[in-house]
């Protein structure tokens, strides 16, 4: 019976030349920063080696990837997909192919399809790509006393699409609260939710729920009876009594502690300074020459003497180049795929800058992309609020400190680390560990903020040994 069925199908194929295209299903689910795989096949099995195979988005002419005449036609792709697709054709003789779409972002959401065309017949299948991002664990903080109660604030970042945030009481009941969600420049949502509770409220939960992934994360805080609500009169009387009784003891204690701890604290500071200096001295042994590539610079960035980048108010007229960034970025002419390398960048009093390395094959035509290791970036940023942050691979906020005017960057390719130094006080800002470097890496600078009054050039500077 099976043999007869095979003969019938073979005869049908030879006579009609028709077949059906089967896609990956009604929808494909993918997480931001990861890859999505679209698998398509022909039924009955038919070789697609001599066919045109087109993956498209929303409409037929919006090409995600094109296979024709036995070759991949990258020139036909939409710019946002160049360098991000991998056409897998190991089983194309049996009519089975796959397309891997790399580094998924929220902007990739939409309707996709695969289309097979022979000389006498064509057919397609479509599906929906759904994208999600799982954000950080909720962070609960106690703001203080408000309107006779205790105000709690819960924060979580990096979600897509917008999640549901709510407070829950000790029995799991939903509590009335105020919430806000704001999308950042990468379409990821930051959630903020607040509530006012009474003393002895017990266990209070902050819950963030993403329905699309059936994913929920919670954090808990226990509100007991020990919270002390300050009354001005009661607080004043208590402070007066304590002040009179303890003033002498405090003064004497401070004197004793001062002399005991002065030497210890100074010794610890000296050790930290020497330790940081030792790391920096070792890094500077691997100093390399770095020059900027003008062909990669955004039109608003002017590169001079191959070392200096200045943010202009108006874009320059520059020749078209596939190497040029659509973000206000520039990379070096030099690239590294082995060894240890150190260079220094003078950022002056600027804010909103990024300094670090990126893979040579990152999508330079895409503006809204998270500069994280998942997307081929290992960078440090200083925001307008003088707050450092980086990704490894998720968002890391670093403790505020005096912003440097010069940043040292130390790349250890085989060691899988990149360190950032404040060369002003010779301290280590942060080290990204367990980095999985692949391919060629280039020194990277993003000069994101334009300030006509305070803005100054950013430049690669000679390594200082002081």
Curated annotation (Swiss-Prot):
It is a single-pass type I membrane protein. Residues 1-17 form the signal peptide. The keyword Calcium does not apply. GO terms for molecular function: signaling receptor binding. Residues 259-466 are cytoplasmic. Keywords: Immunoglobulin domain, Membrane, Signal, Transmembrane, Transmembrane helix. GO terms for biological process: regulation of cytokine production; T cell receptor signaling pathway. One of its GO terms (cellular component) is external side of plasma membrane. It is found in: Membrane. Residues 138-218 form the Ig-like V-type domain. PROSITE patterns: B302_SPRY, IG_LIKE. Residues 18-237 are extracellular. SUPFAM superfamilies: Concanavalin A-like lectins/glucanases, Immunoglobulin. SMART domains: IG (SM00409), IGv (SM00406), PRY (SM00589), SPRY (SM00449). Expressed in small intestine, colon, testis, spleen, and leukocyte. Residues 270-463 form the B30.2/SPRY domain. InterPro entries: B30.2/SPRY, B30.2/SPRY_sf, BTN3A2-like_Ig-C, Butyrophylin_SPRY, ConA-like_dom_sf, Ig-like_dom, Ig-like_dom_sf, Ig-like_fold. The chain crosses the membrane at residues 238-258. Belongs to the immunoglobulin superfamily. BTN/MOG family. This is Butyrophilin-like protein 3. It comes from Homo sapiens. The gene is BTNL3.
